[in-house]
Amino acid sequence: MMEIRLATIEDAHAIYEIEQQSFSVPWRLESVLAELEGAANKLYMVICEENHIVGYAGAWLVYDEGQITNIAIIPSARGKGYGSKLTKQLIDECLTRGMKEIFLEVRISNLAALAMYRNLG
């Protein structure tokens, strides 16, 4: 069963492992911990399948703008719609928290991410 929830500090090691599998320059564990340590201007969510974290997404909330920082899904779970569902939920949570605009940066070479963002509108 799929579940999307707010990330907690207890999720740091799982998020760190997803970082290692997903990015050529992943965040260090210390960076993941710093992002999860409860600052009101940070929002991180995880997506779980059968109680295992398969992806995460995060945003920084500044005034009325959300800046999506990272979206990552473990390689074995990619192409199953998890990224889209998680991104939609993250955007909804940003809007609930009063964000008027939401931004992200993506490499032009990241074709899978570009396709997902286009499909999300």
Q: Predicted regions span which residues?
A:
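Short glycine/proline-centered loop/turn elements that form peptide/ligand docking sites
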Residues: T87, N110-A113
